[in-house]
From Swiss-Prot:
PTM section of the record: Partial processing of ComGG in competent cells requires ComC.
Localisation: Cell membrane; Secreted
Signal peptide segment: 1-28
Subunit-structure text: The transformation pili are flexible filaments, consisting mainly of the major pilin ComGC and smaller amounts of the minor pilins, including at least ComGD, ComGF and ComGG. Interacts with ComGC; the interaction is probably direct. Interacts with ComGD. Interacts with ComGF. May act as a link between ComGC, ComGD and ComGF. Homodimer; disulfide-linked. A minor fraction of ComGG is found as a disulfide-bonded homodimer.
Keyword line: Cell membrane, Competence, Disulfide bond, Membrane, Peptidoglycan-anchor, Secreted, Signal, Transport
Membrane topology: Peripheral membrane protein; Peptidoglycan-anchor
Function: Required for formation of the type IV-like pilus (T4P) that plays a role in transformation. Transformation pili are dynamically extended and retracted, perhaps thereby promoting DNA uptake and transformation. Required for transformation and DNA binding.
Record flagged with keyword Phosphoprotein: no
Name of this chain's protein: Competence protein ComGG
Gene name linked to the record: comGG
A biological process from GO: establishment of competence for transformation
Length: 124
């Protein structure tokens, strides 16, 4: 009964536009959430690898192993560390390089005191 006046066509267009707007909003929210989860996972993996690298390098220093560098492959990435002497005899400077399997790289510098057995500085 309203077809002759053209009421149904504008209503269909309005409802279609509304549905597309809602679908667009939901898709944008989903993509944003997925990207956040991926970036958060990369952050936590990088932090974990850095902490493992610090523990490995400190163990290397305390056990007085030969050589001034080391590398360890983990399930989610790789850790490399280089140990340098500082002007203070008891302190060692350690450079860490971490790369995850997805390609993210992070670096950190720490200063470790052998006498007190504690970290003096951590810089990323």
């Amino acid at each position: 009964m309203y077809r002759t006046r053209g009421f149904i066509y504008p209503a269909v267009l309005f409802v279609s536009a509304l549905v597309l707007l809602i679908v667009n909003f939901v898709a944008a929210q989903y993509i944003s959430r997925c990207m956040f989860e991926k970036e958060t996972k990369e952050l936590y993996i990088g932090e974990n690898l850095l902490q493992n690298g610090v523990l490995l390098s400190i163990r290397h220093v305390l056990e007085e192993r030969k050589g001034q560098e080391g590398t360890q492959q983990f399930l989610y990435g790789r850790v490399s560390y280089y140990i340098h002497d500082t002007s203070i005899k008891e302190q060692k400077e350690i450079n860490l390089r971490v790369s995850t399997d997805s390609g993210t790289e992070r670096t950190a510098q720490i200063v470790f005191d052998q006498k007190q057995k504690k970290l003096l500085r951590w810089t990323e």
